[in-house]
Amino acid sequence: MEEKRTAFIERKTTETSIEVDINLDGEGKYDIDTGIGFFDHMLELMSKHGLIDLKVKVIGDLKVDSHHTVEDTGIVIGECINKALGNKKSINRYGTSFVPMDESLCQVSMDISGRAFLVFDGEFTCEKLGDFQTEMVEEFFRALAFNAGITLHARVIYGKNNHHMIEGLFKAFGRALSEAVSKNTRIKGVMSTKGSI
């Protein structure tokens, strides 16, 4: 019987209290409450389009700003992905997705390599969308990548509408992650000549 690729992590600091529950072999079901409406929406899209079940509950110091809440959520989601992957046997390892959203086009490519790295290429023309600071998009993906052990490249190829560009990135991340964590029966062990990831 296949081992379930799920994880639950709870993290508490003086700034945030976070619970994340993830199922990499899910159906895209979600229950998200970070206290930041726009961020909730982006995580819901990531879950739905990545076919990953995701529950996130956050109590953060939003009276300061969104920084700690968004970054710490990225940390815990990254830790959950890494934990749920287990020994990483038979996974594709690599995933790439291009996602159009009206006038914008975004690309996310990843390698579940155990080597944490982020290349982010995207500029936004407004400071906030709702209560979400747009500069936190990059910080979220950095926190997630470094705690999941993923080499991640995320870029806005072109676009004008800030909402569309950010939405494209989160959808593309979900789809690329789904591809990378999917199992291939032809892969014996892990996808590495070193024998480990």
Swiss-Prot record:
It comes from the Bacteria. Its EC number is 4.2.1.19. It catalyses: D-erythro-1-(imidazol-4-yl)glycerol 3-phosphate = 3-(imidazol-4-yl)-2-oxopropyl phosphate + H2O. The keyword Zinc does not apply. It is found in: Cytoplasm. Transmembrane segments: none annotated. Belongs to the imidazoleglycerol-phosphate dehydratase family. This is Imidazoleglycerol-phosphate dehydratase. It comes from Clostridium acetobutylicum (strain ATCC 824 / DSM 792 / JCM 1419 / IAM 19013 / LMG 5710 / NBRC 13948 / NRRL B-527 / VKM B-1787 / 2291 / W).
